[in-house]
């Protein structure tokens, strides 16, 4: 298999945050989605980074003094992020995809213009490998 599209969860099926969301909006969206990390996009659909629960925790402590009212006034792009998930282009090799997935729970996939088109989860890659290595009887 040499096609990233095989593993892709399309943008329409992904949870994501817009870069103009407040900290409170991000917390609520992440709670509903049930994810510990979520992509950040701008309103043009371009990938801007990844927000993780730990980033939110430190932002609430250091920027908002643990006050949800203050979290309504601060934007998520003000939050120092420890590490963004590095995207791959849709034309990337499977080797590049697997290398990124070894260090990230998901790999954002972008087109040639930097627009987010979806993501590939580490789980999808592992499940594919498991199916190929341990063929069902």
Ranges and model annotations:
Residues 1-14, 71-84:
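Bateman (tandem CBS) regulatory domains
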Residues 1-2, 135-137:
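Short, Lys/Arg-enriched, disordered terminal segments
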Residues 8-9, 31, 61, 80-81, ...:
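Alpha-helix boundary recognition
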Residues 16-35, 41, 86-104, 110-113, ...:
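The conserved cystathionine-beta-synthase
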Residues 35, 39, 46-64, 103, ...:
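Short beta->alpha transition motifs characteristic of CBS
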Residues 59-62, 78-88:
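Regulatory sensory and allosteric helical modules in signal-transduction proteins
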């Amino acid at each position: 298999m040499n096609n990233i599209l095989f593993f892709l969860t399309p943008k329409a099926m992904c949870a994501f945050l817009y870069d103009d969301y407040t900290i409170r909006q991000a917390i609520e969206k992440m709670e509903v989605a049930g994810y510990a990390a979520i992509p950040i996009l701008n309103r043009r659909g371009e990938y801007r980074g990844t927000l993780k629960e730990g980033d939110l925790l430190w932002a609430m402590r250091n920027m908002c003094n643990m006050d949800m009212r203050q979290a309504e006034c601060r934007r998520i792009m003000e939050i120092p992020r420890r590490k963004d998930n590095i995207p791959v282009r849709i034309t990337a090799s499977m080797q590049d995809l697997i290398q990124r997935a070894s260090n990230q729970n998901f790999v954002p996939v972008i087109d040639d213009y930097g627009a987010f088109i979806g993501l590939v989860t580490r789980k999808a890659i592992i499940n594919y490998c498991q199916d190929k290595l341990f063929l069902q009887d």
